[in-house]
Amino acid sequence: GAATRPRVRRKSARHIMLRATEKELNMILAIDIGNTTVALGGIRDGRVCFVARMDTVRTRTAAEYRAEMDKIFAHRRHPERPMRFEGAVLTSVVPQITGALAECARHYTGKTPVIVSPDIRTGLTMGVDEPRAVGKDRLVDAAYAAANFPLPIVTVDLGTATTFNVVDKDRVFRGGVICPGLSTGLRALGERCAQLPQVHLGSPKKAIGTNTESCMLSGSVLGTAVLIDGMVQRIEEELGSPATLVVTGGLAKYVTPLCRHPLTYDPELLMKGLALLYQLNAPQEHGRRHGGGRHYGQQGRLRAKHPH
């Protein structure tokens, strides 16, 4: 009788709480501010649920970025399960707009974002001359790769610049290599050389080109693959052992099939790295004390979650 009633009530309350939780898409908002684009990722339980991009505009205000982000999130809303950002993590190689996007992150989560810097926990020891000068995206790639692949490891990110990062067997970030990016080099050729056309990216069939376009494609795409193979070989010689190679970046899909060194291609390396750094650095119970986070309802409108 009476003795069983509290037990039934507790069970049903817990059941209701679990069902309410299932109705929300709780995510971490990951923001990667690059030279060309700002990537926004929604990460849930270490899995990347979505990635969207907007142009990097150095003169844009926080309000202008927020208007753009509202559109992106409204487009990705789920009709039954509103998205809720319970925290945010941000990395930037464009200091002029870091503050504006950190403000956006606060708006969507109600909390200060984790901002990537050499001061936060990464699982790495910095073994370079100026740790603060290391590109934050390079740090994110290296931290995730070192935590998830055999050491030593080399990560290569093919973006506006092509960057190599090296972590040795003792988890020391040793530095790396920075080169002009594949598309940057192609664009420069088209702009600086009057007789050279703009070339559409693809994977060249062979090294020897038989027309201007195939020569340029070979030089840029196959040339990048040869650069990766040759540079990793030199790095391995300096480390004194073979290294794991992980390649990422929007242009990697054209290059990785042409590389001869064994590699893993992970287009989501940086987003996964941001999720890892959030886990390592966010305060315990981040966001639960004040009922945190904000929801996107069926109309995609932002609505604050009531703390009670």
Identify what each model region corresponds to.
Residues 4-9, 13, 17-20, 293-294, ...:
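Short, low-complexity intrinsically disordered segments enriched in A/P/G/S/L with frequent Arg
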Residues 25-30, 188-308:
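ATP-binding/phosphotransfer module of carbohydrate and carboxylate kinases, centering on a glycine-rich
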Residues 28-32, 89, 153-157, 246:
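Short glycine-aspartate micro-motif
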Residues 28-71, 81, 172-197, 202-203:
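Short glycine-rich, Thr/Ser-proximal phosphate-binding strand/loop in the N-terminal lobe
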Residues 69-87, 231-243:
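Phosphate/pyrophosphate-binding loops at sites that engage ATP/ADP/AMP, CoA/4′-phosphopantetheine
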Residues 78-134, 170-176, 181-182, 210-221, ...:
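Short beta-strand-loop/turn "lid" adjacent to the catalytic site in phosphate-handling enzymes
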Residues 111-192, 221-234, 267, 296, ...:
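Phosphate-binding/catalytic loop of phosphoryl-transfer enzymes
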